[in-house]
Regions:
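Domain-level signal for soluble alpha/beta catalytic cores
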Residues: 1-378
Length: 378
């Protein structure tokens, strides 16, 4: 199998709009009209189609579109031992909309043995093993995202304290569980792992930080950086000391639900921790709107780390002006050399099964557009 790792000059973030056939099958399964075996058969067939489409469009680091998931993150959390699926007091609050209220909660000691996502990866691996120059890339949510979910509401904290008398024990088991899953994925052939992370997208938002100031008289920047160091520590404990030929990239998100968002603010507020200290190979970064700030913070990207510029929105079907995108790439190259820059959508097209507000053909038009620009620039 190809070991050429992402990112590539033209790239994707990973999730794609669920096909109508897949949506119907999932709905039929939830209503008891079909069984798990039949649903899996449909998933397998639709994943093969989405992989073939990515290759047809010239994308060589393919994903399964996250077609087996309802959420980009929760399905993975539910796959751990010691984690239950319950309903939160309310869904995540996005700009003008509230999501479904599913969540994950501690029910016992957390561990990562026999995680179902390993089989999800091996199916994808086998689809491309004979396709020269194509790699199977796999996406999972960040360890810090898992931690944040487990302390989301008072009832989450009450549940975890029954198992973990202190948060250090919780963090240790999160790290060990992730290490187990990553090791299992690697042993099955994975060479490129993408870590999706909305925690940074929360920390850049002053409104998020303000919710904690109400409970404390400390300065908001002190609170922000305390969170940043905690999230950084959890992530880096997982990202470090892995096999040398395993590439770990991360995607930073400000929310992507039905074409809406939850966070706003530039990267400068957490650039020292995120860009200076997080131990990853590349960053997939949102830069499609003013909510993401300017490029100056990219000067903090340490070492020879790469930056994938998410300049093309996945939230609506409108194609940006090519000249504007090329000019923005040139502007970003003032802070990170052009040979370490790449281009992608700002996020996936369907971080949850609802998907964003565009059609499949409009989704593909976005990918054609990205490749066209990348071919011209690089």
């Amino acid at each position: 199998m190809c070991t050429i790792n992402a990112p590539h000059r033209h790239d994707t973030v990973g999730s794609f709009l669920r096909t109508e056939r897949l949506k119907k099958a999932r709905n039929d399964f939830e209503k008891g009209k079909i069984g798990r075996e039949e649903l899996t058969k449909v998933e397998d067939e639709e994943i093969k189609k989405i992989v073939d489409k990515q290759i047809e469009l010239g994308y060589t680091s393919v994903t399964d579109g996250e077609f087996r998931r309802s959420y980009w993150h929760l399905d993975f959390f539910w796959g751990f031992n010691g984690i239950g699926h319950i309903h939160a007091d309310k869904g995540y609050e996005f700009n003008g909309v509230v999501t479904r209220d599913d969540t994950a909660i501690v029910t016992g000691k957390i561990s990562g043995e026999n995680h179902p996502f390993v089989k999800h990866y091996t199916f994808l691996r086998d689809l491309v093993k004979d396709k020269r120059g194509v790699e199977a890339r796999f996406t999972i949510p960040a360890p810090a995202q898992f931690y944040a979910e487990l302390v989301r509401e008072d009832k989450h904290v009450a549940a975890l304290l029954k198992v973990y008398p202190d948060f250090k024990g919780l963090e240790d088991d999160i790290v060990n569980a992730y290490k187990t899953v990553i090791n299992d994925l690697y042993n099955e052939g994975l060479k490129t792992l993408q870590i999706d992370d909305c925690t940074w997208g929360c920390l850049v938002d002053d409104n998020f930080i303000a919710s904690f100031i109400e409970k404390s008289d400390r300065d908001k920047e002190v609170i922000r950086h305390e969170f940043a160091e905690r999230f950084l520590n959890i992530n880096n404990r997982v990202f470090q000391n892995n096999p040398k030929d395993l590439v770990i990239n991360t995607h930073v998100c400000r929310g992507n639900y039905a074409s809406t968002w939850f966070g706003q603010g530039g990267y400068d507020k957490i650039a020292d921790e995120l860009f200076g200290k997080e131990d990853v190979n590349a960053y997939y970064l949102e830069f499609d709107t003013e909510r993401a700030g300017t490029f100056e913070s990219l000067a903090k990207v340490s070492g020879d780390k790469k930056v994938v510029l998410g300049l093309i929105t996945s939230k609506n079907p409108t194609l940006e002006e090519k000249e504007v995108i090329i000019a923005r790439i040139k502007e970003a190259s003032k802070y990170v050399p052009l040979d370490r820059l790449y281009l992608s959508p700002q996020c996936g097209f369907a971080s949850t099964e609802e998907g964003n507000r565009l059609t499949e053909e409009e989704q593909w038009a976005k990918l054609r557009f990205i490749k066209e620009i990348a071919d011209e620039v690089w």
